[in-house]
Amino acid sequence: MHALQAKILDPRLGSEFPLPQYATPGSAGLDLRALLKEDTVLEPGQTLLIPTGLSIYIGDPGLAAMILPRSGLGHKHGIVLGNLVGLIDSDYQGELMVSCWNRGNTPFTIAVGERIAQLVLVPVVQAHFEVVEAFDESQRGTGGFGHSGSH
């Protein structure tokens, strides 16, 4: 398991609410919680930047973190991430913030301490561009959307 440096920015984290942890040995994501001052209503179509009370420092340029939606919130309530995916670079050290978007038709109350997103560490490969006049041929070539078949 990889060590991840973390700073607790809200004293409720680790006392009233548990630190992010894996729910099962097979879990890929650590749940992030809404460390709001009070329960907050997210109106249909509204986005809100929600603090997690936590900052992390990955440090290893071969890793990054992604903030992803929780499937139940999206499927059952229409609550997804306003930026779809949050990318946390290895050298970022600020508070983790979650952009929540209510794409549903009814108001949704985000409770203080509610699990609103998940954090997943992913490997990163940095690349540089090698400018060429032509690419080696491939079977697909320049075929774009829908090129590989309809079903």
From Swiss-Prot:
What are its E.C. numbers? 3.6.1.23
* Family of this protein: Belongs to the dUTPase family.
By which gene is this protein encoded? dut
| Pfam families reported for this sequence | dUTPase
**Entry keywords, A to Z:** Hydrolase, Magnesium, Metal-binding, Nucleotide metabolism
PANTHER family in the record, alphabetically? DEOXYURIDINE 5'-TRIPHOSPHATE NUCLEOTIDOHYDROLASE
Q: Which pathway does this polypeptide act in?
A: Pyrimidine metabolism; dUMP biosynthesis; dUMP from dCTP (dUTP route): step 2/2
Reaction it catalyzes:
dUTP + H2O = dUMP + diphosphate + H(+)
UniProt-recorded name of the protein: Deoxyuridine 5'-triphosphate nucleotidohydrolase
Family annotation (Gene3D superfamilies): 2.70.40.10
Per the UniProt record, which residue ranges are transmembrane? none
Q: Which residues bind substrate?
A: R70, S71, G72, N83, L87, I88, D89, M97
List required co-factors: Mg(2+)
Any GO MF annotation of the entry: dUTP diphosphatase activity
